[in-house]
Amino acid sequence: MNLETIIGLEVHVELKTNSKIFSASPTEFGAEPNTQTSVIDLGYPGVLPTLNKEAVNFAMKAAMALNCEIATETKFDRKNYFYPDNPKAYQISQFDKPIGENGWIEIEVDGKKKRIGITRLHLEEDAGKSTHAADGSLVDYNRQGMPLIEIVSEPDMRTPEEAYAYLEKLKSIIQYTGVSDCKMEEGSLRCDANISLRPVGQEKFGTKAELKNLNSFTYVQKGLEHEQVRQEKELLSGGIIQQETRRYDEATKKTILMRIKEGSDDYRYFPEPDLVELYIDDEWKEEIRASIPELPDARKARYVEEVGLPAYDAHVLTLTKEMSDFFEATVADGADAKLTSNWLMGEVLAYLNKQQKELKDVALTPAGLAKMVQLIEKGTISSKIAKKVFNELIEKGGDPEEIVKAKGLVQISDEGTLRKVVTEILDNNEQSIEDFKNGKDRAIGFLVGQIMKATKGQANPPLVNKILLEEINKR
């Protein structure tokens, strides 16, 4: 029996509003526990929620960027459940009238493009955060009432790789809109994955398992890969899959049962009595649509068609808005687009990955990188010397021209000076000259290396090659 994998994802994104969704409590990350909450967040008797319009605007903006249809009438509902991090014993969410429906995004895996449907996008409030220790549990209600959007995909993904690509694309789009920073390490983006298997050709879905507590896109992919294998073994051996919630354990590389999965009936949804229905007219929708910036796909196409970058460069540069904006600012300061792209995709990304930092955390500026690239273009410094300048720029900042002068890094481009060095090197390496004349091309590399060593790497490489061949041919 051949089995087909069916994957759907539920992604929670914390909106970057100044206050919570139903109260005026602040939303700053990292504050002391239980210092950013109020009687409204905690559901004290007699208090009433007030809807934050900015949260609605952000939800609409995200929904439009994801090609969703925006509701004209939408409402909030109570999702009833008891848990220590939910002080009201219910969560205000949206059940049957979400703010956005029927959206899609396009992903690419192994060179093949595929459209993934988005069932719905709805607004809701976040719960608090529980921390468990050996001698008890602690609850921080700072997160209680934070505005969230939940984005539910169609079960259109067939491999864990497609799920990973979907998450990357979704995160990129949301970041470009500016409604969230989507930092998984801070909990502003969280993902639950649903996976089931069915015989190839069968229309009815198999019984699904839900994977929770997936704190990185890599864990989502690994968890799905393991669950795919687990369910396949179970089904092929004649067993059955139970509807349950599981978590991925990185230490054992397995998914572990958490609980039997609840159905939506278990939550006893009913309309939120303290909030009226929300009507969204065409004028409001158009106001939000006009505020949507250039999104990653459009920017990528522009980089290829107008800027002239290779498709791969355009893809890498537009993965994050931070990198793309940095590229644009550097080119706007007069740097060559392709040279800038090479430095960003090479040295800059390598440094950021090694140091586990973002561009905003380093001293490098678009103006600084632009000046350095221009020095390379003018021949003032070589690409090799530029790496020394770059290390200074990204660690401490400064003016590239001043760094070059202070460290004596100006490239030697005087032909007379270089010819003298070349002649001296050749006089001391006659065997290498013979080797080169006998067809051993590696000999020229050795000679160039000796010249670069003698000039402390500051010789102009193209000029060195030209003079070297001229002097060899004279002998």
From Swiss-Prot:
InterPro entries assigned: Asn/Gln-tRNA_amidoTrfase_suB/E, Asn/Gln-tRNA_Trfase_suB/E_cat, Asn/Gln_amidotransferase, Asn/Gln_tRNA_amidoTrase-B-like, GatB, GatB_C_1, GatB_Yqey_C_2, Gln-tRNA_amidoTrfase_suB_CS
GO MF annotation, one: asparaginyl-tRNA synthase (glutamine-hydrolyzing) activity
Enzyme Commission identifier(s): 6.3.5.-
Keyword field: ATP-binding, Ligase, Nucleotide-binding, Protein biosynthesis
Pfam families per record: GatB_N, GatB_Yqey
Catalytic activity, reaction form: L-glutamyl-tRNA(Gln) + L-glutamine + ATP + H2O = L-glutaminyl-tRNA(Gln) + L-glutamate + ADP + phosphate + H(+); L-aspartyl-tRNA(Asn) + L-glutamine + ATP + H2O = L-asparaginyl-tRNA(Asn) + L-glutamate + ADP + phosphate + 2 H(+)
Enzyme class: ligase
SUPFAM superfamilies according to UniProt: GatB/YqeY motif (SSF89095), Glutamine synthetase/guanido kinase (SSF55931)
Ranges annotated as spanning the membrane: none
Gene Ontology biological process terms, A to Z: glutaminyl-tRNAGln biosynthesis via transamidation; translation
PANTHER family: GLUTAMYL-TRNA GLN AMIDOTRANSFERASE SUBUNIT B MITOCHONDRIAL AND PROKARYOTIC PET112-RELATED (PTHR11659), GLUTAMYL-TRNA(GLN) AMIDOTRANSFERASE SUBUNIT B, MITOCHONDRIAL (PTHR11659:SF0)
Described purpose of this protein according to its UniProt entry: Allows the formation of correctly charged Asn-tRNA(Asn) or Gln-tRNA(Gln) through the transamidation of misacylated Asp-tRNA(Asn) or Glu-tRNA(Gln) in organisms which lack either or both of asparaginyl-tRNA or glutaminyl-tRNA synthetases. The reaction takes place in the presence of glutamine and ATP through an activated phospho-Asp-tRNA(Asn) or phospho-Glu-tRNA(Gln).
Family statement: Belongs to the GatB/GatE family. GatB subfamily.
Subunit structure: Heterotrimer of A, B and C subunits.
Record's protein name: Aspartyl/glutamyl-tRNA(Asn/Gln) amidotransferase subunit B
Originating species: Bacillus mycoides (strain KBAB4)
